[in-house]
From Swiss-Prot:
Pfam families membership: Glyco_transf_11
Name of the protein: Galactoside 2-alpha-L-fucosyltransferase
Keyword Secreted carried by entry: no
Species name: Caenorhabditis elegans
Family that this chain belongs to: Belongs to the glycosyltransferase 11 family.
GO BP annotations, alphabetical order: carbohydrate metabolic process; macromolecule glycosylation; protein glycosylation
C-alpha cells in the first residue's frame, strides 16, 4: 500500500512538473508573438523597375540598418547612416528609417543620444510594399557597390539590402555636411579648449587610436599590437615631433605596454574613450589632432578618428595584410581607406616602412 501511495505521489509531482514546463513554453511563445520582431524584407520584390523618364513623385531610400539593429558601436553606425544619406543624395531620394520595423525604432538610442543632429536628418515613415523594390548587395563589409541602374530605378521605395556599407565612397559627396553635423556643440568646445594647456596650444599633436576591448577575444578582428604600435609611434613622432595622445578603451594596458616604452614620456598623454560618450573622441580629433595613427586597421571607430582629423594627409594606418585580421578577406582596401591616407608596414627587422 505504501508503494502505491508513493507511486501516486511521484506521478502527481511529475505531472505538475510537466504542466509547469508546458505553461512556461506557452507564455514564452505568446510573449514572442506579441513582442517586436525583425521586419521581413524578403516580402519585397527584387525586380528593378528601370525607366528613363523623370518621375516627379517623392522617392525614398532605406537600408535595413544592421548596425543599429544589433547595437554595434558608434563607428559602425556612423558608416551606415552616412552611407544612407550620401547614397540618397546621389540618387535624388530622401533617406528614411523604416517606421514599420519596431526593433529598429527601439534601438535608435545610441544615435539619438550621441549624435542627435545626425539622427534628425533621417525621418521614419512606413513603407508601402507594393511600391517598393529591394536590391541585394554582396555580404561584404568594406566594398563599394553602386550599380548604375540605381539611377533609373523609379519605385517609390528603394531598399538596398546590404551589410555595414563601410566605404567612404558612399558619402564622399557629403563630406562637408558630415563635418558640419559632427561639429562639437558650444559646451563641448569649451571642454576641448581646456584639455590643452596654454604652453601646448601651438605644438604638433599626434593622436594614436589603440583598440583592445572585445577585439582581444574576437576571431574576426585583430587588436592593437604593442610591438608594432611602439615602433609606429616612434616613426610618426620622428616625422612630426610634438605631443602624443594615446586614445584607447584600455588605458591600463596602454600605460604598461605602450607609454612606458616611449622615450618622450613627458609628451605622452593617455586618453580613455568614454563608454557612453565615444563621440567626444571624434570632437577631440577635429579640434586637436594634426596627425592620426590607426593601429587596429579594421577598427571603424579608429577610422572615424582619422577621418575627422585636421589634416587628411597625415593619417597613418597599419597594413591589414600583415595582421591576422579576418576582415582583410572581406575588405577592398581602396574602398575603405581614403587615397590620401598612408599605409604603414613593418620589415623583418622591425623597422616601420611606408607602403
Amino acid at each position: 500500500m505504501r508503494n502505491v501511495k508513493g507511486l501516486f505521489s511521484y506521478m502527481t509531482k511529475t505531472k505538475s512538473f510537466y504542466i509547469s514546463i508546458i505553461v512556461i513554453i506557452f507564455i514564452i511563445f505568446i510573449v514572442n508573438r506579441m513582442g517586436p520582431r525583425n521586419y521581413n524584407y524578403k516580402q519585397i520584390g527584387t525586380e528593378i523597375n528601370c525607366v528613363k523618364h523623370k518621375v516627379d513623385e517623392q522617392r525614398y531610400l532605406l537600408f535595413p540598418m544592421i548596425t543599429i539593429l544589433y547595437k554595434y558601436g558608434l563607428g559602425n553606425q556612423l558608416f551606415e547612416v552616412f552611407s544612407l544619406l550620401g547614397s540618397a543624395q546621389t540618387l535624388n531620394r530622401t533617406a528614411i528609417f523604416n517606421a514599420d520595423d519596431d526593433i529598429l525604432q527601439s534601438k535608435l538610442d545610441l544615435l539619438q543620444k550621441q549624435v542627435p543632429q545626425v539622427a534628425a536628418r533621417i525621418i521614419s515613415i512606413p513603407i508601402e510594399i507594393a511600391e517598393s523594390t529591394r536590391y541585394l548587395f554582396l555580404p561584404a563589409c568594406c566594398h563599394y557597390q553602386f550599380p548604375s541602374l540605381f539611377s533609373c530605378e523609379r519605385s517609390k521605395f528603394l531598399v538596398i539590402d546590404g551589410q555595414y556599407f563601410q566605404s567612404f565612397k558612399y558619402f564622399s559627396a557629403i563630406d562637408s555636411l558630415i563635418r558640419k553635423l559632427l561639429k562639437p556643440p558650444i559646451d563641448e568646445e569649451i571642454i576641448l579648449k581646456k584639455m590643452i594647456g596654454r604652453k601646448d596650444e601651438l605644438r604638433f599633436k599626434n593622436c594614436v587610436h589603440i583598440r583592445r576591448g572585445d577585439y582581444v577575444n574576437d576571431f574576426d578582428h585583430a587588436e592593437t599590437s604593442s610591438y608594432f604600435t611602439i615602433r609606429a609611434i616612434d616613426y610618426v613622432h620622428t616625422l612630426h615631433p610634438g605631443l602624443v595622445y594615446l586614445i584607447s578603451d584600455d588605458p591600463k594596458w596602454v600605460r604598461k605596454q605602450i607609454a612606458e616604452h616611449l622615450d618622450y614620456h613627458d609628451d605622452v598623454k593617455i586618453m580613455e574613450t568614454p563608454i557612453n560618450a565615444a563621440i567626444r573622441d571624434l570632437y577631440f580629433s577635429q579640434a586637436h589632432c594634426d596627425s592620426v595613427l590607426i593601429t587596429a586597421p579594421s577598427s571603424t571607430f579608429g577610422w572615424w578618428i582619422g577621418y575627422m582629423s585636421k589634416n587628411q594627409s597625415n593619417v597613418y594606418y597599419r597594413d591589414i595584410q600583415e595582421t591576422d585580421d579576418m576582415v582583410k578577406y572581406k575588405m577592398v582596401e581602396e574602398d575603405f581607406f581614403p587615397p590620401t591616407w598612408k599605409k604603414l608596414g613593418m620589415s623583418r627587422n622591425g623597422s616601420i616602412i611606408s607602403k
